[in-house]
């Protein structure tokens, strides 16, 4: 597998996602922008949309997470594309949505399995795999977290999780909030990685990164920052998770 930790940050993971600017002002601006985004982007969630990410086209169907409305999808895809995976790599894309990260991984890896709990997202990701000519190296499965890949191990796991704590209101809201995703994902990572494998998880300063980082360490995962990007009201970071040999807390 390609070395995806070549550009580790010197800062501690907990420091990376400190919101830019004054915290109170940042939260206020973020809430205002969130309202505007929901109002102006509603049609892009409720209708069929054709979006372009790094030169590739993606059909986004209703109730499926749109990779162009938040910044996360394009940021993660850009990282995957610029750190090309080894040709023999086997990859799991957790919570694939429209399939953006899975498809960019499948352009280079030998095999990609994508998983989503939203049945509409599963159908959407399959369409996009065919649209981008990687259906022969990718498979999309329906189910919750690691359930569809029980007993399987991968060189790399990708995850752009719901950042917010709470009960999702509908299928689309599952991409934004969950009460226990940090705990359940962290508990299952080790059992689904091959020796020498790693997971990449994208988190935002808008969400509660603390519970994720705490759970990763509690489950004996070494956490390092491999990419970060700052915006006016938000910071994004990609964290690399590696199981510690003794399984102890990091």
Listing of model-derived features with the role each one plays in the protein:
Residues 26-27, 54, 59, 80, ...:
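A short alpha-helix capping/helix-coil boundary motif
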Residues 31, 38-90, 94-101, 124, ...:
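SAM-dependent Rossmann-like transferase core, predominantly class I methyltransferases
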Residues 119-122, 134, 138-243:
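S-adenosylmethionine
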Residues 77-166:
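Conserved SAM/SAH cofactor-binding pocket of Class I
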Residues 6-20, 46-48, 113-116, 123, ...:
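Short low-complexity stretches enriched in small and charged residues
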Residues 2-53:
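N-terminal auxiliary segments of SAM/dcSAM-dependent transferases
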């Amino acid at each position: 597998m390609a070395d995806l930790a070549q550009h580790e940050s010197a800062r501690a993971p907990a420091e990376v996602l400190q919101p830019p600017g004054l915290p109170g002002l940042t939260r206020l601006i973020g809430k205002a922008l969130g309202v505007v985004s929901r109002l102006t982007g509603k049609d892009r969630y409720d209708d069929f949309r054709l979006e372009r990410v790094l030169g590739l086209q993606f059909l986004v169907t209703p109730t499926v997470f749109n990779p162009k409305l938040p910044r996360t999808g394009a940021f993660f895809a850009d990282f995957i594309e610029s750190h090309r995976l080894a040709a023999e790599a086997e990859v799991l894309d957790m919570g694939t949505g429209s399939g953006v990260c899975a498809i960019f991984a499948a352009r280079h890896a030998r095999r990609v399995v994508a998983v989503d709990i939203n049945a509409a997202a599963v159908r959407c990701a399959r369409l996009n795999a065919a649209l981008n000519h990687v259906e022969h190296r990718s498979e999309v499965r329906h189910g919750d977290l690691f359930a569809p890949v029980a007993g399987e191990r991968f060189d790399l796991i990708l995850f752009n999780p719901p950042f917010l704590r709470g009960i999702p209101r509908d299928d689309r809201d599952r991409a934004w909030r969950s009460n226990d995703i940090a705990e359940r994902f962290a508990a299952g990572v080790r059992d689904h990685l091959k020796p020498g494998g790693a997971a990449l998880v994208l988190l935002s300063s808008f969400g509660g990164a603390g519970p994720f980082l705490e759970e990763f360490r509690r489950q004996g995962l070494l956490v390092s920052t491999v990419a970060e990007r700052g915006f006016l009201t938000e910071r994004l970071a990609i964290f690399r998770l590696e199981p510690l040999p003794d399984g102890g807390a990091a």
